Amino acid sequence: MFVNHSTVARWENASRLPDAAMICRLAKCLSVDVNELFQLAARSKENPNVIVVDDSKVILSDCLSVLKEVIPNAMITGFIWPLEAIEYAKNNRVSLSVLDIELGTASGLDLCNTLLEINPCTNIVFLTAYADYSLEAWKTNASGFMLKPLTAENVKEQLKKLRYPFSIEGAYK
């Protein structure tokens, strides 16, 4: 069986998915139970889990509305306090984290590093009113950077650029 990086990448971004026969062959090659792979495939269709962290309740509310419009199948949760977001990420697989950089006395850059320690496959997109932070933000392995206010168009563009794409069925069609 021939599977290369581009094959796996197409599976990951859901532009091409393995059929049942391919999953059976993969299970044999990997010496795993085929049912385990089918269960993993079913879970990959789960709704993405998105968190937003911003210390402004007004901005947080606006962000949640925009994200719900663009990714209607996502479970979207907002946090004002970074520690609450960390606890949530420890107990839930987060697909996308939208983080303000200035979080009162806390730093969104530090929060990014903590979230990536919890799950290295979390997509981090920074959202800030200050373009000056862009260079620092890129040093964190973030997937993207957006300036406030958040717009549906900006979110759509960022979703195309995620390091770890996830299923966005029904999103912005």
Predicted regions and their residues:
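DNA major-groove recognition helix of helix-turn-helix/homeodomain DNA-binding modules
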Residues: 21-36
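Two-component/phosphorelay signaling modules centered on CheY-like receiver
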Residues: 57-77, 117
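Acidic, metal-coordinating helix/loop segments flanking the phosphotransfer/catalytic sites
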Residues: 78-96
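Active-site residues of response regulator receiver
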Residues: 100-101
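The feature encodes the CheY-like receiver
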Residues: 104
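Short amphipathic alpha-helix used as the core "switch/output" element in two-component signaling
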Residues: 109-121
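C-terminal output helix
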Residues: 150-159
